[in-house]
UniProtKB/Swiss-Prot annotation:
It comes from Bartonella tribocorum (strain CIP 105476 / IBS 506). Its cofactor is Zn(2+). The keyword Protein transport applies. Pfam families: P-loop_SecA (PF21090), SEC-C (PF02810), SecA_DEAD (PF07517), SecA_PP_bind (PF01043), SecA_SW (PF07516). GO terms for cellular component: cell envelope Sec protein transport complex; cytosol; plasma membrane. This is Protein translocase subunit SecA. Part of the Sec protein translocase complex. Interacts with the SecYEG preprotein conducting channel. Has a central role in coupling the hydrolysis of ATP to the transfer of proteins into and across the cell membrane, serving both as a receptor for the preprotein-SecB complex and as an ATP-driven molecular motor driving the stepwise translocation of polypeptide chains across the membrane. PANTHER family: CHLOROPLAST PROTEIN-TRANSPORTING ATPASE, SECA INNER MEMBRANE COMPONENT OF SEC PROTEIN SECRETION SYSTEM.
Length: 905
């Protein structure tokens, strides 16, 4: 019997089919305009941009411009590059405009498709960010697609890692900006560490299109972007801890490859304790005593570095440095470092220079960064397997965009062998057969080590004409990929995700022109050579097609089905023929971790002989089930990370908004006044609680606090003896005294100097306390999980305690800022120029490069001048010169300088 759901789908169509139907109707509207737009001159087509902007300014909705705007871009692409976007690309463009994820097969033209919604949304004048995975793709796409936008009167900028602030600011000011996800995130963090608005580079987060969206928003979601500063050097300690691990035997520790964790057994813990005790580092009796928390952390990192992290798979050693390898793409990630001491443990393991640990100055995850955009969309070749995560976390629906031509690639069943040795023999045999008929072959491996092992096997078998593409040789990446579709080409590559360059049968025309004609100037000779190259590529493509198209061989299944699909998708682009096959063994990581012992026993019972493969749908289903388990686990990890990061993100928003308010304010006196009153009220409430008798008042402590914070000596003790006096009256008298002191101080300096000093103190204090708060939150996060053993929800505990930390930080902020502003003295050298005006980013005061090592204006004083103590006037701080921290304060208080006027210097 047919279910109601099946009947309804047959009658009404699925949600996907209904959505496609609506999009195809819009495509028909765009196509109907084509004849009209073809007749326009170049100038008339360019003028469409101003006409659209005018209509928007008059109140028209951007959605209503879509058919005309898309028709405009289509016509411009035809005139600039002789490329006419297909109907399916128009569909993909509409998905992106509607804040969805367009899943398009490799080679279907995602880059050109993106120009349609980019142009439409850039008309609003608020900036469009196009996000790529590396600088090469950002600059390539900005250069190629920028010509279309320039033709239509729009500006295009690109953010590269080596640009200075002025160049970045100019790029962000363009209508369209191409950049990597890392550069965007770090620029956002740096903007929120700036002293002045003129130092900021970004101008908001209006609309972003993320290329390879699954790589950026899924694979990298677990890694926060961190700007950090160095802590003390502990090289000797890391090297010492590293010497302990080789002395351990397998019984001393346990490894969980599924969860990627390591733990010491009881025997192993005793061994480590003895070694630490002999080295003089163990405090108390046990490694797990509270005094040894930091040591436990470092010992665990050393164990992880040796037992979980594999050289040439997880990282490589290059130029005396540990360089992380992206597990999903096989790319090196220079500049990235593991946090919390793990990177230092790896450096000690490999005996390279150990860099100091860093303190977090600012951080954000990609999840929270990209959720700031008012409109967010993405495109990729593989997103369907992660559709639930995109919907739950980012509110993005995945739409599979139909291919322009039917896919002709043959995806063959997996071949499974008992051992890795048998598997590699079969792979080499298959490669030889395909190579002999000149079929282009792409072999995908999961690590550098395995790609080089396969390369060595091929050499021993007499096959030497191949290219290896992995993190070691990434500089040659684009050229190797460009030639991977040539007849007879054999390319061995680590994971292909995010490579960004299509494998075109016959070779890549543009790449060959750049390589072969770089020294030939424009002219008849160059034109003739270009035609020769095009003709040659066309002939080579015909040979590659005759050989069966690109053959993709995978040597292992990845944890994620998406990565496997990306590798398959390299073949069969734009309707070309091709084939793909996975060769597996029970010794592969995925099979070994997820229960291959049971499978091995079954295969033995079935009588599987050496060098025999088994091909069975049941095994494919078992593999897919294992992959789904890993994907679900990783999703839970990312979802959990987001829950904790959301707590920090709420605090981050408050702090960054507060900083922005301070930076933008011309007059901060009202904010300072409120802070000062809050501090005084808190003090009075602490030492003279409302509703209590005077006998309970601690007026002596209140007097000391007032002296410490405000440098005010007030007779609070005498006031408290007055008949019938209430705490409100004492509060009022203190506020009057503080206000009088503040007014006297304000009169001594110009409004410009006061405003500058107030801003400097506020921003410096906010940044310092926020850094300390981040450290506290990290520590809280690392231990809060143990609350689960006490039947308490770790997340709720984290929320509660992080809120208390935040409240404490804000209270400290008010106290420190108030005290600094009530106690400061600005001492200006006679030769010091007058307060300069801000003239923009190049002003000598506001330019980071010019002022890199100089103290801010308010801190430049005669404090380094040594003065005879007899020549110091207690009432004139300008006569004190340099005062030692432990000297008696020259003011006459008899306190040490560091506890009096030097408390906040």
């Amino acid at each position: 019997m047919v279910s109601l759901g099946v009947f309804a789908r047959k009658f009404f169509g699925s949600a996907y089919e209904r959505r496609l139907k609506v999009l195809r109707q819009k495509v028909a509207q765009i196509n109907a305009l084509e004849e009209q737009f073809v007749k326009l001159s170049d100038e008339q087509l360019c003028q469409k941009t101003d006409a659209f902007r005018k209509r928007l300014s008059e109140g028209e909705n951007v959605d209503s411009l879509l058919p005309e705007a898309f028709a405009t871009v289509r016509e411009a692409a035809k005139r600039v590059y002789d490329m006419r976007p297909f109907d399916v690309q128009l569909i993909g463009g509409m998905v992106l405009h509607d804040c969805g994820i367009a899943e398009m097969r490799t080679g279907e033209g995602k880059t050109l498709m993106a120009t349609l919604p980019i142009y439409l949304n850039a008309l609003e004048g608020k900036g469009v960010h196009v996000v790529t995975v590396n600088d090469y793709l950002a600059s390539r796409d900005a250069e190629t697609m920028g010509k279309i936008f320039s033709f239509l009167g729009m500006t295009t900028g690109v953010i590269l890692h080596d640009l200075d602030s002025d160049a970045r600011r100019a790029a962000y000011a363009c209508d369209i900006t191409y950049a990597t996800n890392n550069e965007l995130g770090f620029d956002y963090l740096r903007d929120n560490m700036a002293f002045d608005r003129s130092q900021m580079v970004q101008r908001g987060h209006h609309y972003a299109i993320v290329d390879e969206v699954d790589s950026i928003l899924i694979d990298e979601a677990r890694t926060p972007l961190i700007i950090s500063g160095p802590l003390e050097d502990r090289t000797d300690f890391y090297n010492l801890i590293d010497t302990f691990i080789p002395a351990l035997i397998p019984e001393d520790y346990e490894i969980d490859e599924k969860q990627k964790t390591t733990t010491f057994t009881e025997v192993g813990t005793e061994k480590i304790e003895k070694m630490l005790e002999q080295a003089g580092y163990l405090k108390g009796e046990s490694l797990y005593d509270i005094e040894n928390v930091a040591i436990v952390h470092h010992v665990n990192n050393a164990l992880k570095a040796h037992k979980l992290f594999v050289r040439d798979k997880d990282y490589i050693v290059r130029n005396d440095e540990i360089v992380i390898i992206d597990e999903f793409t096989g790319r090196m990630m220079p500049g990235r470092r593991y946090s919390e001491g793990l990177h230092q443990a790896l450096e000690a393991k490999e005996h390279v220079a150990i860099q100091p640990e860093n303190q977090t100055l600012a951080s954000i995850t990609f999840q929270n960064y990209f959720r700031m955009y008012r409109k967010l969309s993405g495109m990729t070749g593989t997103a369907a397997t992660e559709a639930e995560e995109f919907r739950n976390i980012y509110g993005l629906d995945v739409v599979e965009v139909p291919t322009n031509l039917p896919v002709q690639r043959l995806d063959e069943d997996d071949e499974i062998y008992r051992t890795a040795e048998e598997k590699y023999r079969a792979i080499v045999r298959d490669i030889r057969q395909a190579h002999e008929k000149k079929q282009p072959i792409l072999v995908g491996t999961t690590s550098i080590e395995k790609s080089e092992q396969l390369a060595e096997r091929l050499r021993k078998e007499g096959i030497t004409d191949f290219k290896v593409l992995n993190a070691r040789y990434h500089e040659q990446e684009a050229y190797i990929i460009a030639q991977a579709g040539v007849p007879g080409a054999l390319t061995i590559a680590t994971n292909m995700a995010g490579r960004g360059t299509d494998i075109q049968l016959g070779g890549n025309v543009e790449m060959r022109i750049r390589q072969e004609l770089q020294d030939i100037p424009e002219g008849p000779e160059r034109t003739a050579k270009i035609e020769e190259i095009k003709k040659d590529v066309k002939q080579l493509k015909e040979k590659a097609l005759a050989a069966g198209g690109l053959y993709v061989i995978a040597t292992e299944r990845h944890e994620s089905r998406r990565i496997d699909n990306q590798l398959r998708g390299r073949s069969g682009r734009q309707g070309d023929p091709g084939r793909s096959k996975f060769f597996l063994s029970l010794q592969d990581d995925l099979m070994r971790i997820f229960g291959s012992n049971r499978m091995d026993g079954m295969l033995q019972k079935l009588g599987l002989k050496e060098n025999e493969a088994i091909i069975h749908p049941w095994i494919n289903k078992a593999l897919e089930k294992a992959q789904k388990k890993v994907e679900a686990r990783n999703f839970e990890i990312r979802k959990n990370l987001l829950k904790y990061d959301d707590v920090m993100n709420d605090q981050r928003k408050v702090i960054f908004e507060q900083r922005m308010e301070v930076m933008n304010a011309d007059d901060l006196s009202e904010m300072i006044h409120e802070m000062r009153n809050d501090v005084v009220e808190d003090l009075v409430e602490t030492y003279i609680p409302s509703g209590t008798y005077s006998e309970k008042w601690d007026v002596k402590a209140l007097e000391e606090e007032l002296q410490q914070l405000f440098n005010l000596e007030l007779p609070v003790k005498e006031w408290a003896k007055e008949d019938g006096i209430a705490e409100e009256q004492i509060l009022e008298r203190i506020l009057d005294a503080v206000t009088k002191l503040e007014d006297e101080r304000t009169e001594r300096y110009s409004p410009e100097v006061m405003a500058y000093f107030q801003k400097a103190v506020l921003l410096e204090t906010i940044d310092t306390l926020w850094r300390e708060n981040l450290v506290s939150l990290d520590h809280l996060r690392s231990v809060v999980g143990f609350r689960g053993y006490a039947q308490r929800d770790p997340l709720n505990e984290y929320k509660t305690e992080s809120f208390e930390l935040f409240q404490s930080m804000l209270k400290n902020l008010r106290r420190i800022v108030t005290s600094k502003l009530m106690r400061f003295e600005i001492i200006q050298q006679p030769t010091e120029p007058s307060m300069p005006e801000q003239t923009g980013a190049d002003s000598s005061v506001f330019n980071d490069q010019n002022q890199e090592n100089a103290p801010p204006l308010w801190a430049r004083s005669q404090e380094n001048r040594f003065v005879n103590p007899q020549d110091r006037d207690p009432n004139d701080v300008t006569t004190w010169g340099k005062v030692g921290r432990n000297e008696r304060c020259p003011c006459g208080s008899e306190k040490k300088y560091k506890h009096c006027h030097g408390a906040f210097v």
